Amino acid sequence: MNYQTILEEIEKEIQALFVEGKVASYIPALANVNPNQFSMAIKMFDGQTFGVGEIDKKFSIQSISKVFTFTLALNYYGKELYKRVSHEPSGNPFNSLVQLEYENGIPRNPFINAGAIVTADTLVSIYKNDTFNQILDFIKMVSNDKTIDFNEEIFHSELEHGFRNYALINMIKSFGNIHNDIDEVIKTYFKQCSIMMSPSQLASSMLFLANHGINPITNERILTESKAKRISSLMLTCGHYDASGDFAYKVGLPGKSGVGGGIVAIVPKKMAICVYSPKLNTQGNSLIGTKALELFTTKTGLSIF
């Protein structure tokens, strides 16, 4: 199968969609990106890369970071983690307060904001004031790339404008499900969302999940096959907020989106994919990125179903 040709076909077919969607505007630093960007990268287990667009241009990974922090936490705590954050789809917007109150401060899953904040708290319990460095080092390790870092401007923009996330962490704290200082936890969370990566780096970073826990480039086991499968299943059922069912229906791959415009997806035992296009649909997922992945699975037949 000629993946490069398929990517070039997809790039042509999505052009008409550039009139739709809006870039994230809840923090100013995200609103300033060029809305008409599109890039897509595929990483194979043998190290081959296929791509269209500027696949080495970095963007803010935002909620894609939740996959890395959940991996770290699940690796350390195992099933104990589910006492703090559940593993069910939410059906509500990613920053919803309503369900959180109804369910006594236990977030539905680690991929909505409340769940990722609790996950960050569990990591602060382990790593204390070195938590962000540990997260960043883990991402560098699974990406085989030591150049990855966060963006100070986006981090400070999140700190100044992330009011809904402050509301979430205070509500969770009131239910006793935040064990550390809330300022330390929220700063860790905002910093992880401000990490900058390219489609090429992000596709590389997901190969260990596509390979059931082993990085196929280095042959290093990152986590057990069982835990890798759990994370992949959560990506399928919860990876796109309240549009997760729609993504599973149309794309049929485990994936995770971020409001920065990125989406990662994995084809088990084959490859990892990252697509970037900053215009979002109403659920906060990349509109063109979702369509590009739908076209990819249609053209290749590589859905998990």
From Swiss-Prot:
Enzyme Commission number, as recorded: 3.5.1.2
Statement: the UniProt record of this protein carries the keyword Cell cycle: no
Keywords: Hydrolase
Listed InterPro entries: Beta-lactam/transpept-like, Glutaminase
Source taxon at top rank: Bacteria
Listed name of the protein: Glutaminase
Subunit structure: Homotetramer.
UniProt GO BP: glutamate biosynthetic process; glutamine catabolic process
Binding site for substrate: 63, 113, 158, 165, 189, 241, 259
Catalytic function, reaction form: L-glutamine + H2O = L-glutamate + NH4(+)
Keyword Hydrolase: yes
GO-annotated molecular function: glutaminase activity
Homology family: Belongs to the glutaminase family.
